[in-house]
Curated annotation (Swiss-Prot):
Catalytic activity annotation: urea + 2 H2O + H(+) = hydrogencarbonate + 2 NH4(+)
Primary localization class, coarse: cytoplasm
Enzyme class: hydrolase
HAMAP family on file: Urease_gamma
Gene Ontology cellular-component annotations: cytoplasm
Subcellular location: Cytoplasm
This protein's pathway: Nitrogen metabolism; urea degradation; CO(2) and NH(3) from urea (urease route): step 1/1
Identification of the protein by name: Urease subunit gamma
Subunit details: Heterotrimer of UreA (gamma), UreB (beta) and UreC (alpha) subunits. Three heterotrimers associate to form the active enzyme.
Originating organism: Ureaplasma parvum serovar 3 (strain ATCC 700970)
Entry GO MF terms: nickel cation binding; urease activity
């Protein structure tokens, strides 16, 4: 299988997000990398589904609550920016304060 660098990065994010989902299901709090991967995956999948940028910017802020992440992670993640492909082209989605307080 010949994957481009971008495809490898997307695959790694998806795997990390899957690990994060399983840890949340076990009641564990997520670290920085897991939290970012989960929110990034939400944006990537939403774009693939054809959702609007504005809708993704809002819904991504509802993926995680502060009680689901380790102490201090919410302050470390002030913005997540994801470049994703929508049906009408590639766009940068910026999610400010992505962890719901």
């Amino acid at each position: 299988m010949n994957l481009s660098l971008r495809e490898v990065q997307k695959l790694l994010i998806t795997v990390a997000a899957d690990v994060a989902r399983r840890r949340l299901a076990r009641g564990l709090k997520l670290n920085y990398s897991e939290a970012v991967a989960l929110i990034t995956d939400h944006v990537m999948e939403g774009a693939r589904d054809g959702k609007l940028v504005a809708d993704l910017m809002q819904s991504a802020r509802e993926v995680l609550r502060v009680d689901q992440v380790m102490e201090g992670v919410d302050t470390m993640v002030s913005i997540i920016q994801v470049e994703v492909t929508f049906p009408d082209g590639t766009k940068l989605v910026s999610v400010h304060d992505p962890i719901y307080k």
